Amino acid sequence: MVSSDPMTGKNVQHDEHLSANHHVTVEEVVAMATGADQTKYSLWTLSMLRLYGCLVIGYLCATVNGFDGAVMGGINAMVSYQKYFHMASASSSTGIIFAIYSIGTACAAPFVGPVNDRWGRRAGMFVGGLFILVGTAVASRAINHGMFMGGRFILGFGVCFVNVSGPVYVGEMAHPVWRGPLSGLYNCFWYIGSIVAAWVVYGAKTLENGWRIPLYCQFIASGVVVLFAWFLPESPRWLVSHGHLQSARKVLARYHGEGDLEHPLVNLQMTEMQYQVSTEGSDKRWWDYRELWKTRAHRNRLVCVLSMAVFGQWSGNSSTSYYLPVMLENAGITSQSRKLLLNGIYAPLCFVASVSGSMFLDKAGRRPLLMSSLVGCIICFTIITPLSKVADQDPSNSAAANASIAFIYLFGITFSFAWTPISPMYVVECLDTHTRAKGKSMAQFFTACASAIIQYSSGPAFQHIKYYFYIVFIGWDLFELAFIYMFWPETKDRTLEELEEVFQASRPVKRSLEPRSSQTVLNTVHVDAKPVTDGIV
């Protein structure tokens, strides 16, 4: 089959049946795995510096989303915004304005996978960025409630594209030796947007129509993504899935192999990809989502993906992000200036926690960090509930108010340490190349639905039952803790292709906790051999 190479524009001949025509022996596989494992790697080589530049564009996709989370929570507390639209900070109208963003995201989900599969990850980021620019223009210049909601809907529509394309691109481009921290840093950039938004809101709090200024700032990150998306190398896994083997090898050599086309790590990745990625997979059929659930292994993957999509929104974090000023009000803080100041301090603390957590992903593992974080969140909510009640009933009790605020912050830090870096990357890791874009877009749909529900319900809940709303999160987080322990496998220490062995197992969690070995690589490339005992790490 002949097609145009997206990297060079030239026609290239490629094979429709990679795994059928690419045979390797047991000895060759073990030699490749051992060579890749014994090679010394550095974080500061020219190849890695180039890679960081590419990943930053992907990271900015998270910044776009983080900016909105903080900007809406911030301007919702601004008097100028409330007066302009005649709204209260916690009401059903406020919930609708927050939720319409997630509704836009949900509506975009069916289109995101096909765009990524047909035209690549770069195209997904570019298209999403364009929608965000349009939505920002509409919302920032809104003269009535309907126009503002329309802009929010378009913003949410575009964010779905970047929220899928960005983490998928980062996960597929990240160097396998440091995939944990490099992929984990993606969602940490959520807080970059959040920090900028919170402080722009604080600076504009006294200006007439000051609520528009933070919205204008949404042009920045999305504009950078649009400008630079087409200068990025395409994902090597997408290239292999479309038969562009030569281009994929060049990308891997340039960004993972110090320019060496025969680098051990390049050879290992190319071999694993050629056996795991098909040029006839369901990603070539835009309408075909069946591969997400047609086998037991795919169903195992889908359970992890969709549960992460919901858990990542319902652990208490969404309410904290969008309704932090309202939570502070429940804790006895009524001054607009102080609420916005505390809102501005919250994001930097969470950012530091999330970056710190990303450094431990490959050391501690995904499961232990997530479960430990949930235990901390449960403890925080258990303490916040009575403290907020005391502070609300006795405004003069500054000790209760300050303690309540401290534990609200501690919740954010605890959640951010694990869930912020892990949430998007775990979804990417749990999907294979054929289903990654569609699966991530389905996860984004469930995330949007879960987010819309919690955003819409949190406003009335805080208005009517106030601090008792936290009890709901205590019970739900306990359920999440048990679910993760039973059903979520560990994904560290394996390449994306090697995770197939985990999900194919009858007990994926048990298999995932077994150490990686040469046998893992043999199973990945479907080479039959007696069990190999020489472990590689």
Please place each PLM-identified region on the residue numbering.
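Transmembrane-helix signature of 12-pass secondary carriers
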Residues: 2-253, 278-537
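Short intracellular "coupling" helices and adjacent cytoplasmic loop segments at the cytosolic face
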Residues: 255-268
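Cytosol/matrix-facing amphipathic helices and coiled-coil assembly/linker segments
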Residues: 266-282
